[in-house]
């Protein structure tokens, strides 16, 4: 049984299954559900199709019965593995680290939650333990939203304490920033430059880009868009640009600018999104917007203090990146708390320290014993 409940082996098994966000995550979800069933979980398969028709699966596992227990929330999707630079889809232990895409973000943390819940005796549980493995976190969190809206297992055993197990080096995180994108497309008229009959979308979008350059400077000091609980307090205002591969001897038919920044939990970011959209529409450009709010729970909230106490008194902090916490917090008070370092996420050579993985598993089990038994 000890070998079967090895978080390193379980993480490696999931790393070996490619589950990049833009494609489906069916295979890794089948693996997770099969493992859960083999270890005494009642499971629920929640599936939808994304805008590209890809199947996206969310697995909810439950041990025990009764509301007011523990919920552990992770995702099975990953960013692309950059296969030209390393072998990302093979879990490899070297020294005191486990390497592979998703080892840190976040198949390792998911494995720790699964092992912790599997290790407890269901007959001794007075409240249920929920373990969820969702899709599309890297693309905006649709899987978490879908799960909170459609999971009957979770609704019937709604936890009082939620752990979003993203990598925080096992430091409790009570607040984080979100993400906003404004996609602006200028349309010209394609033609060979020898005819001089085209209209370059690159020239059309240039005045808007100049406005964004000025706006980027002003938002750094505008108190409406700053959150002083965070380091840095600014929102990381950025812009990327593409004319979709147009060559220099062709007038560009399209040019797309994507403006992005990180909203705080309670700033005025909606106003900034609307201002950018209005400026783009002034020029007649196509505009789409998306904004995911940041997250904040009081640092003295019960779930935050639980993580702090059971991790040896680590003090709660804030982080500038985003997680699925806002989606799950619609139902369950959450703290972000997981093994591994965010500096390893999305990197070539991504790894998780084995000591962190084992420590997380032990802490998660103590949480279950404290809250559910």
Where are these regions (language model features)?
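Acidic/His- and Gly-rich active-site-bordering loop/insert found
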Residues: 2-101, 122-125
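Short beta-strand segments
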Residues: 73-75, 132-134, 163-166, 185-187, ...
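Acidic-glycine-rich active-site phosphate/pyrophosphate-binding loop
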Residues: 79-94, 158-159, 174-185
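Phosphate-handling active-site elements
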Residues: 94-96, 116-131, 155-158, 212-222, ...
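Acidic/histidine-rich catalytic neighborhood of metal-dependent amide-processing enzymes
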Residues: 107-181
């Amino acid at each position: 049984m000890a070998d079967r409940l090895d978080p390193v082996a379980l993480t490696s098994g999931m790393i070996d299954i490619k589950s990049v966000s833009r494609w489906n995550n069916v295979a890794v979800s089948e693996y997770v559900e099969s493992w859960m069933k083999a270890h005494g979980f009642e499971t629920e398969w929640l599936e939808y199709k994304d805008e590209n028709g890809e199947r996206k699966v969310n697995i909810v596992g439950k041990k025990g019965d009764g509301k007011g227990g523990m919920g552990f929330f992770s995702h099975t999707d990953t960013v692309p593995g950059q296969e030209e630079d390393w072998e990302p889809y093979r879990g490899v232990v070297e020294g005191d680290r486990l390497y592979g895409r998703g080892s840190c973000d976040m198949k390792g943390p998911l494995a720790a939650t699964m092992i912790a819940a599997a290790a407890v005796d269901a007959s001794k549980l007075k409240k249920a333990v929920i373990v969820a493995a969702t899709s599309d976190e890297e693309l905006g969190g649709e899987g978490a939203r879908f799960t909170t809206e459609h999971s009957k297992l979770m609704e019937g055993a709604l936890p009082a304490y939620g752990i979003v197990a993203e990598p925080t080096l096992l430091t409790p995180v009570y607040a984080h920033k979100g993400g906003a994108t404004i996609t602006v497309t200028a349309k010209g008229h394609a033609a060979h430059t020898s005819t001089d009959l085209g209209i370059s979308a690159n020239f059309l979008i240039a005045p808007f880009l100049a406005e964004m350059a000025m706006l980027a400077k002003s938002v750094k000091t505008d108190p409406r868009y700053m959150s002083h609980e965070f380091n840095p307090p600014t929102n990381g205002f950025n812009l990327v640009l593409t004319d979709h591969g147009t060559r220099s001897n062709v007038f560009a038919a399209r040019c797309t600018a994507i403006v992005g920044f990180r909203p705080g939990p309670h700033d005025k970011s909606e106003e900034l999104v609307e201002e950018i959209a209005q400026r783009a529409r002034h020029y007649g450009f196509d505009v789409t917007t998306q904004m995911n709010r940041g997250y904040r729970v009081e640092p003295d909230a019960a779930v935050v203090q639980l993580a702090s106490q059971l991790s040896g008194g680590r003090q709660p902090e804030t982080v500038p990146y985003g997680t699925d916490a806002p989606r799950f917090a619609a139902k369950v008070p959450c703290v972000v708390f997981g093994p591994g370092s965010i500096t390893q996420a999305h990197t070539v050579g991504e790894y998780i320290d084995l000591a962190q993985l084992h420590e997380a598993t032990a802490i998660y089990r103590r949480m279950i014993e404290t809250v559910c038994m």
